[in-house]
A protein has these predicted regions:
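Gram-negative bacterial Sec-dependent N-terminal signal peptides
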Residues: 1-21
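A compositional/structural signature for long, glycine/proline-rich flexible linkers
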Residues: 21-435
Length: 435
């Protein structure tokens, strides 16, 4: 009798529609989603980059110096970028010119957004320029005797080079063009991993978990909890393939998971003080995949804090959104000036919101930096004005124009910040509205 009862129960359970099967708990889905989204954002960028005319693996793209055409641009450097692709037998050689008297770095990142290294005189004091050979993990391929051997985390990496413009943009551009990338053979290059298209305004849903095995196999994650997280991802991937659960899983992701992640990315992924958000802890994330994915979403390819820390402000000292209807002043005391807390340089840029583009103005003045020749006050303090028109309270040379009546955001960059900045002990002062 008992055997017959168990058999009948089994038949009834088998007949229950798959849609009634229980979904994984919301936290498991959230963790798996946030973890894998970081990789998806990098895949999306790879797909986008390789669609551009003239862009190919192991080919450097030399971006225009100080171009204001990008979103929240860095107008202080000449940029160069490339996708590096190697295989077990084929290294890729990077040649770095000798750079004197200005900041430079060749930042190398893996496909999860982790910084592998920065090639410059600080990290390679005995070989600050010359040849650097990138090889696949575990590769025994020979490299030139005069090249520094650098093992990548997987078979692809992103190169982002920066050369400070200072007061000589032509000189920076000449140096930029001297960075060369050459494969030592013909590497077997796999295309970007499969990933459905998505935008930041409407993040990907359950489609994130399609092709899970191919995505995870495409790039090694060096996070100490990668195995644990990838087990969760595979579990959700199995659920996503179940037609009875797919719709419910997509609904959960879009209505609960995505809003929770976006709130974290905007309000909790950095350190807030004086209504400035500091990008502390970027570049190398350890087990903190929430911060890594947030950094990838907000500014993919974030660098390590030894190289740069960003401070971002969208509100004034009273917590009100910055707006071009008002005049604001950022006042550094003589002892708290940004030039005193960097070993390279600092800069501040104003961009409109929500487009994050520079504000066109007759002065073509979009940012200030260490070489802008700003006027100090008699006591050594420094005032910077953000307003739609000059204000007698601040020297006109220190005025960054805003768009009348339009919201804006400020980004203050500190390059090669000193230890107190990296420890979170220095922040820009709150931005005050002039009455």
């Amino acid at each position: 009798m008992l055997t017959k009862f168990i058999a009948s129960v089994a038949l009834v359970l088998a007949a229950i529609p798959a849609a009634q099967a229980q979904l994984p708990d919301q936290q498991t889905v959230t963790d798996a989603y946030v973890y894998l989204l970081g990789r998806a954002i990098a895949i999306r960028q790879e797909q986008t980059d390789l669609k551009e005319p003239g862009i190919a693996y192991n080919v450097i793209k030399y971006n225009p110096a100080g171009s204001a055409d990008f979103v929240n641009p860095n107008l202080d450097v000449a940029y160069l970028e490339a996708w590096i692709a190697v295989d077990g037998k084929t290294p890729v050689l990077l040649e770095v010119p000798e750079v004197k008297g200005r900041y430079y770095t060749a930042q190398i990142l893996d496909e999860w957004g982790e910084v592998i290294t920065n090639i410059n005189e600080r990290n390679y004091p005995s070989h600050p320029f010359g040849k650097f050979a990138f090889v696949a993990p575990g590769s025994t391929a020979k490299v030139p005797a005069d090249a520094v051997r650098i093992e990548l985390h997987s078979r692809k990496a992103k190169l982002l080079g920066r050369v400070e413009l200072k007061t000589d943009p032509a000189g920076a551009m000449a140096l930029q063009k001297q960075f060369k990338l050459t494969p030592l053979g013909k590497p077997d290059i796999k295309p970007a991993a499969p990933m459905a298209s998505f935008g930041n305004k409407e993040l990907i849903g359950v489609e994130l978990f399609d092709n899970v095995e191919a995505v995870l196999a495409s790039a090694l994650d060096v996070s100490p909890i990668a195995a644990q997280m990838q087990a969760k991802v595979r579990d959700i991937g199995r659920q996503a393939r179940d037609p009875g659960q797919r719709q419910a899983l997509d609904k959960l992701i879009k209505e609960e998971v995505v809003p929770k992640f976006l709130n974290y990315a905007v309000t909790r992924s950095g350190v807030f003080q004086n209504n400035w958000l500091a990008t502390l802890g970027t570049g190398n994330y350890g087990a903190d995949y929430w911060k890594r994915t947030s950094a990838n979403l907000v500014g993919l390819w974030a660098n390590a804090n030894d190289e740069v820390i960003y401070f971002v402000a969208t509100r004034d000292a009273d917590g009100q959104p910055l707006n071009g209807a008002n005049d604001y002043v950022l006042e550094f005391s003589a002892a708290n000036r940004p030039d005193a807390v960097v070993n390279a340089y600092w800069s501040v840029i104003l961009v409109d919101v929500p487009d994050y583009r520079v504000v066109k103005n007759p002065l073509n003045r979009f940012n200030f930096n260490s070489d802008s020749g700003l006027k100090s006050e008699a006591d050594g303090s420094l005032k910077i004005l953000f307003a739609p028109r000059p204000n007698a309270a601040v020297p006109e040379s220190n005025w960054l124009p805003s768009a009348p009546g339009k919201g804006f955001s400020l980004t203050l960059r500190t390059y090669v910040p000193k230890d107190l900045v990296k420890r979170g002990e220095w922040f820009p002062p709150a931005i005050k509205r002039l009455k």
